[in-house]
Amino acid sequence: MKNSIGVLSVSKFYHSAVKAELKRRGFQKNTAKKIIKTHKEIMNRAKEIGNSRLVSSYVMGSYFIALNRSTGRSAEENYEIFRDGLCASKLFHKIMGDADSYLDPKRIPARRQWSEDSHKRKYENDWVVDILPGNDEYDLGYDYHECGICKLCQDEGCPELAAYLCRMDY
């Protein structure tokens, strides 16, 4: 995958959050270096997904795979490291926004266009999704038919890791 400014920025963000968590947990300094090196190797092999709305999730998938290959810890513990690092990040909370901004009706047309475009399957590893209008159970729904993280994990020979990343979808 191309190392665009967006990809590099997201990679740096995830790395800084995880690096701080590794330090809090007493990992050796070279662990963070090993993770970023492995992450770069995975991203170089990763299939292109274009200017996807979920490029940050794709980068997250690569980074989580690298974390699992570098720490010697279980996937569950690596999930906790990643989750806790993100939750401790002030920038993460700013980026996430709140429910009102997420559910802003002005965003719905762009989401519907994204859904329509996703069904064209322009990029093999991109997501395919339907945007569902709210009902009595939820305000806004996403029905994912194909998941870029699942595809990346499959390509990297670790499909079992995708389930941990689904837990980060909040």
Task: Give names to the regions the model predicted.
Residues 1-53, 57-74, 80:
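Sequence termini and other peripheral, non-core segments
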Residues 5, 129-131, 170:
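Generic structural motif
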Residues 27, 73, 156-157, 168:
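Short coil/turn linker and secondary-structure boundary residues
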Residues 59-61, 65-156, 162:
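Amphipathic interaction/junction segments at domain boundaries or subunit interfaces
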Residues 163, 167-170:
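C-terminal structured interaction module
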